[in-house]
A protein has these predicted regions:
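Ordered, amphipathic secondary-structure segments that act as subunit-interaction surfaces
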Residues: 27-35
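Helix-start/capping segments and mature chain N-termini
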Residues: 1-24, 43-181
Length: 181
């Protein structure tokens, strides 16, 4: 299922705009967030055809999602009481409405003294972290949850491609907390 919004720019136009934003912000590397949103010409749930399609590109320096200490020593995680949505609203797009669950999950984790939350699907299997895909590497095998309840985005696809290039076996399967041990 697609969200059915026609972006009025080509991939080439968007790529050039992202490069220009990085240059304007004096960034050699950083985080780029292109967003697509509908205008305000009309109100209501059925007014999509009457609304303009807008695109904005933000970029900023962001050295790492976790601090360097976390990379060296690991982080503490908790099992979130918040359940992950079915394949984020049946779309392989990042949709802002699906972040509500993740925000509640990570805030709950922090209130419990952990750095991150792991969300489960409706069947009790691991879906993903509050802001990241989850991968386990054991015995030259990369394991990751199926895409039924996680975002199958660029990052996930890139990690899988890199793992295959490194000759790791890649297994997409239902994962439990016991698999993390």
């Amino acid at each position: 299922f697609k969200i059915n919004i026609s972006i009025p720019y080509s991939i080439s136009d968007l790529t050039q705009a992202q490069k220009a934003a990085m240059i304007k912000n004096n960034l050699q590397e950083g985080y780029i967030r292109p967003i697509v949103f509908l205008g305000s010409e009309s109100m209501g749930l059925r007014s999509q055809d009457a609304l303009s399609v807008n695109v904005a590109i933000a970029c900023w320096e962001w050295p790492s999602y976790m601090d360097p200490e976390a990379k060296r020593n690991g982080i503490s995680v908790v099992k979130s009481p918040f359940q992950q949505y079915d394949n984020p609203l049946y779309s392989n797009n990042k949709i802002i409405g699906t972040y509500v669950n993740s925000i509640m999950a990570v805030n709950d984790a922090i209130s419990k003294g952990a750095e991150e939350a792991i969300l489960l699907d409706k069947n009790g299997f691991i879906s993903e972290g509050s802001g990241e895909n989850l991968f386990i590497v054991k015995n030259s095998k990369l394991m990751t949850p199926t895409t039924d309840y996680c975002l199958n985005g660029i990052t996930r696809q890139s990690v899988i491609t890199i793992a295959k290039n490194l000759k790791l076996t890649v297994e997409e399967k239902n994962l439990t907390f016991e698999d993390l041990l």
